[in-house]
């Protein structure tokens, strides 16, 4: 059974939700004055001029922790629509979801063994 008509509303929503921000950026680009001055190149911190160098280096553990978070956050984005249409899709989709979750568990075990989840 081909389910394309069920997803037409979804694709229209995706196109419109992609078009609106692009139009907003285009209109602001056309209407905003272009000024390249020293004020535009400064960093803004709550209306106060920054003291010292505004650029700092973060430790690598912040990046690895954020990367693991993003991976598992995207996992929930993929699993939510599957859970909402669980009864319609049948056993084949259930097995596919189990394989997907199993691959993610392997990734979690790998990150755990590499100590990517430890803060110290």
From Swiss-Prot:
It is found in: Plastid, Chloroplast thylakoid membrane. NDH is composed of at least 16 different subunits, 5 of which are encoded in the nucleus. It comes from Psilotum nudum (Whisk fern). Keywords: Chloroplast, Membrane, NAD, NADP, Plastid, Plastoquinone, Quinone, Thylakoid, Translocase, Transmembrane, Transmembrane helix, Transport. GO terms for molecular function: NADH dehydrogenase (ubiquinone) activity; quinone binding. GO terms for cellular component: chloroplast thylakoid membrane; NADH dehydrogenase complex. NDH shuttles electrons from NAD(P)H:plastoquinone, via FMN and iron-sulfur (Fe-S) centers, to quinones in the photosynthetic chain and possibly in a chloroplast respiratory chain. The immediate electron acceptor for the enzyme in this species is believed to be plastoquinone. Couples the redox reaction to proton translocation, and thus conserves the redox energy in a proton gradient. Its EC number is 7.1.1.-. This is NAD(P)H-quinone oxidoreductase subunit 3, chloroplastic. Pfam families: Oxidored_q4. Belongs to the complex I subunit 3 family. The keyword Plastid applies. InterPro entries: NAD(P)H_OxRDtase_bac/plastid, NADH_UbQ/plastoQ_OxRdtase_su3, NDAH_ubi_oxred_su3_sf. It is a multi-pass membrane protein. One of its GO terms (biological process) is photosynthesis, light reaction. It comes from the Eukaryota. It is an enzyme of class 7 (translocase). The chain crosses the membrane at residues 7-27, 64-84, 89-109. It catalyses: a plastoquinone + NADH + (n+1) H(+)(in) = a plastoquinol + NAD(+) + n H(+)(out); a plastoquinone + NADPH + (n+1) H(+)(in) = a plastoquinol + NADP(+) + n H(+)(out).
